[in-house]
Amino acid sequence: MSKQSFYPVILAGGSGTRFWPRSRRRQAKQILALDGKQTMIQKTMERLLPLGTEKDFWVITNEFLAGEIQRQLPAIPPRQVVVEPDARNTAPAIGLAGFLLERTAPDSIIGMFPADHVIADEKKFRKVLQRAIEIAGREDHIVVMGVQPARAETGYGYIETGDKMETELFRVKRFTEKPNQQRAEEFVTAGNYYWNSGIFVWSARTLTRALREHLSETTPYLEQIAAAWGT
């Protein structure tokens, strides 16, 4: 698969409340340099560049962060920094990106990446991501990256895996949002649960088809926005 066919979409619309007081609405953690060097969104883009090209990146953010993100990531075309007029959680942001790319690059593979991840082994991460891209390209699959839980964490969502398809590749049985402590401990003990990383990979067509099926009330509005984008 060529680099040009993979489009990373960085989700950077957080309000900055969970990292308060260091993080604020206009200084959310994704635009902060917590290590004193690169900001989290800069690290996210750098981590993904071996698999994509700068001109193929998209960012979904809000009006308070858009200007600073464009300053920090000047290589991304301004029209590809999408500003949400109102925060409506993740699904509409992902949906808008999907419909925009369906129009501009219908054969593309799309990856959705939170802007605030810390990943220690980036080489291994890219290896797993490359495999996800290949699977999404050859199959009509939505691929989600799971993380082996290190503890019974109540702050993350969990993925319950079902049948094994290939080495380290499983069907998803169900998603569970942030559980209480008891359930989190049960998940870790069971051995077939993973933390939900929030990283998804799919073809543009697979994504938009799923949106039309499962987000039917919102989809027409997203399609209208995508059709008018850049006009």
List the predicted regions and their residue ranges.
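A structural signal for short, well-ordered beta-strand segments and their strand-loop junctions
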Residues: M112, V144-G146, N196, V201
